Amino acid sequence: MKMVLSQRQREELNQAIADYLGTNGYADSLEAFRKEADLSTEAEKKFGGLLEKKWTSVIRLQKKVMELEAKLTEAEKEVIEGAPTKNKRTPGEWIPRPPEKYSLTGHRASITRVIFHPIFGLMVSASEDATIKIWDFETGEYERTLKGHTDSVQDVAFDAQGKLLVSCSADLSIKLWDFQQSYECVKTMHGHDHNVSSVAFVPAGDYVLSASRDRTIKMWEVATGYCVKTYTGHREWVRMVRVHIEGSIFATCSNDHTIRVWLTNSKDCKVELRDHEHTVECIAWAPEAAASAINEAAGADNKKGHHQGPFLASGSRDKTIRIWDVSVGQCLLTLNGHDNWVRGLAFHPGGKYLVSASDDKTIRVWDLRNKRCMKTLYAHQHFCTSIDFHKAHPYVISGSVDQTVKVWECR
């Protein structure tokens, strides 16, 4: 199809070509072109670099078109393959589907953690830019920034009511933030000798657990800010700490390739899980609803060899995800499919699925009962570092080294 330019567009294009020839030293070509196009020898400033600008704009537009075409192809594929619509699928079967609902920008460095508020329509992102940002996940609106840390914020967690937020940082501190009114830091705790990599509230909300590169886990009293216990046993950097919903046990994972399950009220390690072949980056406790799917996948008969749990998922730099029965210290399932480190895990509230985030830039949805990856979302332009699944609303959020936070609608 022949494109027709207006007289003014032709004149601007000719001037831009003349400027390009002149600035790049094509004197003979410039002279011939001016004569052919009937241009004056006086070059106007507004045409300086115009051809290059138009060229790069076209490339950017082409890239956007390709991205949109990929998303459209994905959507068409789902329709052709007869993927059930949101109306036909029960909430227990909803999974995140492309394209993302929102891609949120504002952080100036990698995102380290994303979490949902337990009650309000808010989510929180932590970043290597030393800030914590609050967003409305339903509208995609930015709310506010919490500042106080002086180095990368490594993890954030809410208490059960969402009244307090705890954060930890490479600046060696743990901070408590009022999330009801002031959004101010109300306490700062010090005690670790190295990067504090993870934090979690115990369910009652009166204590916080922290994990550090100094190889220890510490328990802090919220009311006083005092350290009341130190748990030792890991031989390397402790990457993550996550408390079981009942509160009597918690799990940690480490660069020493192990996961440890601890008794909260004592300093005793209940069990050590040792099948990973590299650093264990992340862990997640399975909800009770996942028990039947995990048991079926493990091939356990309901009468004989039934696994009671509790069950824990772990993701590693060995690119695998493992699911454990921590009551007996046994690995029940291994999920293979990621092409790089597994950095984040979250169970579907309905218990049928597990979602994972990886340095291969994807989010994967795993059908636990059938031990297979049922969907791959090409989620980010760089490593995916964190993921969370809302307990009540059909949303998943992810964070990345590409400095974006993405909101995915489940249907």
From Swiss-Prot:
InterPro entries, alphabetized: Dynein_regulator_LIS1, G-protein_beta_WD-40_rep, LIS1_N, LisH, PAC1-like_LisH-like_dom, WD40/YVTN_repeat-like_dom_sf, WD40_repeat_CS, WD40_repeat_dom_sf
Listed GO CC annotations:
axon cytoplasm; cell cortex; dendrite; dynactin complex; dynein complex; growth cone; kinetochore; kinetochore microtubule
Give the WD repeat ranges.
Answer: 106-147, 148-187, 191-230, 233-272, 275-334, 337-376, 379-411
Positions the record marks as coiled coil are: 56-83
All residue ranges annotated as the LisH domain in the record: 9-41
Q: What is its main location?
A: cytoplasm
Which residues form each disulfide bond in the chain? none
What the entry lists under SUPFAM superfamilies is as follows:
Lissencephaly-1 protein (Lis-1, PAF-AH alpha) N-terminal domain, WD40 repeat-like
Q: Which PROSITE patterns match?
A: LISH (PS50896), WD_REPEATS_1 (PS00678), WD_REPEATS_2 (PS50082), WD_REPEATS_REGION (PS50294)
Q: Kindly state which keywords UniProt assigns to this record, in alphabetical order.
A: Cell cycle, Cell division, Coiled coil, Cytoplasm, Cytoskeleton, Microtubule, Mitosis, Repeat, Transport, WD repeat
Q: What Gene Ontology terms describe what this protein does at the molecular function level? A: dynein complex binding
Q: Where in the cell is it found?
A: Cytoplasm, Cytoskeleton; Cytoplasm, Cytoskeleton, Microtubule organizing center, Centrosome
Q: Name one GO biological process term.
A: intracellular protein transport
Gene3D superfamilies found in the cross-reference section: 1.20.960.30, YVTN repeat-like/Quinoprotein amine dehydrogenase
| HAMAP family referenced in this protein's UniProt entry, alphabetically | lis1
Free-text comment about domains: Dimerization mediated by the LisH domain may be required to activate dynein.
What exactly does this protein do? Positively regulates the activity of the minus-end directed microtubule motor protein dynein. May enhance dynein-mediated microtubule sliding by targeting dynein to the microtubule plus end. Required for several dynein- and microtubule-dependent processes.
Q: Which family does it belong to?
A: Belongs to the WD repeat LIS1/nudF family.
In Swiss-Prot or TrEMBL terms, this protein is called Lissencephaly-1 homolog
Q: Which organism is it from?
A: Drosophila grimshawi (Hawaiian fruit fly)
